[in-house]
Amino acid sequence: MRFPHICIMMNTLSDLSELSVLKGPNSISELRKYASILVIDDNEFAPESSLKRNGYQIQHKIDLDTMKDVEPYDIILCDISGVGKKLGFKNEGAFIIREIHASYPNKRIIAYTSYTYNPNYNQFFSMADFVAPKDLAI
């Protein structure tokens, strides 16, 4: 499923229900049913069960085996630290974001982290459609 434009209206992950989709599903329930979400995080993703209960199609991976692992998903929520190690990426999740941005320009990327990074990481964060702290309320 291709989403040419997604605009996040609020500041929480649950606000994915407030997405404005120019072409695609006609309702929020259709978006939940058809938009697939991949979470790449080496830690437990606490909101996963809540999002699933609310009808979201969500999959959690601790790391990627190959970059092709992201192909089936429309929205990728990627941690910055602790992921990308299997692929040997020096900048871990930041490099995953760069690769998704370059290889899959129609995917929506959310950088998700609990750390503050030095300005060298700004180039990676700018490739994400949205940057969210891990303590974001859901």
Tell me what each language-model feature is.
Residues 1-38, 42-49, 54-56:
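Non-catalytic signal-transmission and effector/linker regions of two-component phosphorelay proteins
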Residues 70-106:
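Conserved phosphotransfer microenvironments
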Residues 45, 59-66, 90-93:
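Helix N-cap/capping motif at the beta->alpha junctions
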Residues 130-133:
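A structural signal for hydrophobic residues in beta-strands of small regulatory alpha/beta folds
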Residues 43-47, 80-88, 115-118, 137:
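Short acidic, S/G/P-rich loop/turn micro-motifs used as interaction or catalytic elements
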Residues 51-73:
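A short, well-structured beta->alpha microelement
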Residues 95-124, 128:
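A short, hydrophobic beta-strand element within the central beta-sheet of small alpha/beta folds
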Residues 39-42, 61, 76, 100:
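Conserved sequence signature across two-component system core domains
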